[in-house]
């Protein structure tokens, strides 16, 4: 993995920093694991915007990722590493001994040809998936389930990792990158190691058009709008908004707690840092 800086041949190229990985497969994806993906533009079935700042972008196809890692007892080998337009992490195509191929999130340190295995008896090596009860305390893991068999939900983005800090009475305590300490069932599957492509956070797109290629539309400040569009809008000349920062719907923002899932509060040992 290397960072490539562009020469300032134009204003749009001056600050561009991209990542380059010679290990990535240069061809197309493995077709049996690819499905069509239609864009929503941030709209729901009623045509109303439910997620702002989405629209346009390059056409993408979805790669079906094995987040459950339920191929237990069958050894596999990483066939190749690939770019995935749907996520910040790279993905690895694994060929198992029975002939089946599956995509997984590519961990750091896994190369083409690396052995991969899932199950209680798998070795504690990057890329292998085990139940949390079989992973030693202090180990860094990623792609962690919150419910056994549901599939990985935690630590799936580039460079992400979670540390197993304790295990007792059928529950494992994890320390997340945000500083949150959370308890999950010890039967949940997790993959050893950290997610690769950690340099993703160091890239600089350099121009607005590159962001539009990703399907991201501009973010307009509330104070630049009219009063009908935002609580901060309106006023003669430039104003500071006249109130504490709020969303377009009047909800406090910038530090206001919005978590509402009280049902799972009992699993959070320590809240994340703010």
Swiss-Prot record:
Composition-biased stretches (Basic residues): 50-61, 254-274
GO MF terms held by the record: rRNA binding; structural constituent of ribosome; transferase activity
Highest taxon of the lineage: Bacteria
Keyword annotations of the record: Ribonucleoprotein, Ribosomal protein, RNA-binding, rRNA-binding
UniProt xrefs under NCBIfam families: rplB_bact
One GO biological process term: cytoplasmic translation
Protein name (record): Large ribosomal subunit protein uL2
Pfam families (alphabetical): Ribosomal_L2, Ribosomal_L2_C
Quaternary assembly: Part of the 50S ribosomal subunit. Forms a bridge to the 30S subunit in the 70S ribosome.
Function: One of the primary rRNA binding proteins. Required for association of the 30S and 50S subunits to form the 70S ribosome, for tRNA binding and peptide bond formation. It has been suggested to have peptidyltransferase activity; this is somewhat controversial. Makes several contacts with the 16S rRNA in the 70S ribosome.
Region Disordered, residue ranges: 36-61, 223-274
InterPro entries from the UniProt entry: NA-bd_OB-fold, Rib_uL2_dom2, Ribosomal_uL2, Ribosomal_uL2_bac/org-type, Ribosomal_uL2_C, Ribosomal_uL2_CS, Ribosomal_uL2_dom3, Ribosomal_uL2_RNA-bd_dom
Signal peptide: none
One term under GO cellular component: large ribosomal subunit
Similarity annotation: Belongs to the universal ribosomal protein uL2 family.
Chain intervals with Polar residues compositional bias: 37-46
Annotated gene: rplB
Source species of the chain: Halorhodospira halophila (strain DSM 244 / SL1) (Ectothiorhodospira halophila (strain DSM 244 / SL1))
């Amino acid at each position: 993995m290397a960072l490539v800086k562009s020469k300032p041949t134009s204003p749009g190229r001056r600050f561009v920093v991209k990542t380059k990985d010679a290990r990535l497969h240069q061809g197309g994806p493995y077709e049996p694991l690819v499905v069509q993906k239609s864009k929503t533009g941030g709209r729901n079935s009623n045509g109303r915007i439910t997620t702002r700042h989405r629209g346009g972008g390059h056409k993408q196809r979805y790669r079906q990722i094995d987040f459950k890692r339920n191929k237990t007892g069958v050894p596999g080998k990483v066939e190749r590493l690939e770019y995935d337009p749907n996520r910040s992490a790279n993905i690895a195509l694994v060929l198992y001994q029975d002939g089946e191929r599956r995509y997984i999130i590519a961990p750091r340190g896994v190369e083409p040809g690396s052995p991969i295995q899932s199950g209680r008896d798998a070795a504690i090596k990057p890329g292998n998936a085990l139940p949390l009860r079989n992973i030693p305390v202090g180990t860094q893991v990623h792609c962690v389930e919150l419910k056994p068999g549901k599939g990985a939900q935690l630590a799936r983005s580039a460079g992400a990792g979670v540390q197993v800090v304790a295990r007792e009475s059928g529950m494992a305590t994890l320390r997340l990158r945000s500083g949150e300490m959370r308890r999950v069932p010890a039967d949940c599957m997790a993959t050893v190691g950290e997610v690769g492509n950690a340099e993703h956070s160091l890239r600089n797109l350099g121009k607005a058009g590159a962001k539009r290629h990703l399907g991201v539309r501009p973010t307009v400040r509330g104070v630049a709008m009219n009063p009908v569009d935002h609580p901060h809008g309106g006023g003669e000349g430039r104003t500071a908004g006249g109130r504490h920062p709020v969303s377009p719907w009047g909800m406090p923002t910038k530090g206001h707690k919005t978590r509402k899932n009280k049902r799972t509060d009992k699993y959070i040992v320590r809240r994340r840092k703010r």
